Amino acid sequence: MDPCDCAKTGACNCGATCKCTNCQCKTCKKSCCPCCPSGCSKCASGCVCKDNSCGSSCCQ
């Protein structure tokens, strides 16, 4: 089950506390967004959320 409605609302809930906005993706992972808002670093795994924002070093 998809934990977010980013395809509908444009917001991804990543993990328990982080929320990515302006998403264009259709699915979300539990700890990563496969889409990143402008200003977030991007990589193959998406953007890793740290605290309440998207981490700048996301590749793991």
Curated annotation (Swiss-Prot):
Organism: Carassius cuvieri (Japanese white crucian carp)
SUPFAM superfamilies, per the entry: Metallothionein (SSF57868)
Chain positions recorded as a divalent metal cation 2 binding sites: 6, 12, 14, 25
Designated name of the protein: Metallothionein B
Residues that coordinate or bind a divalent metal cation 7: 49, 54, 58-59
Annotated positions binding a divalent metal cation 4: 32-33, 43, 47
Entry binding sites for a divalent metal cation 3: 14, 18, 23, 28
Region (Beta): 1-28
Family affiliation: Belongs to the metallothionein superfamily. Type 1 family.
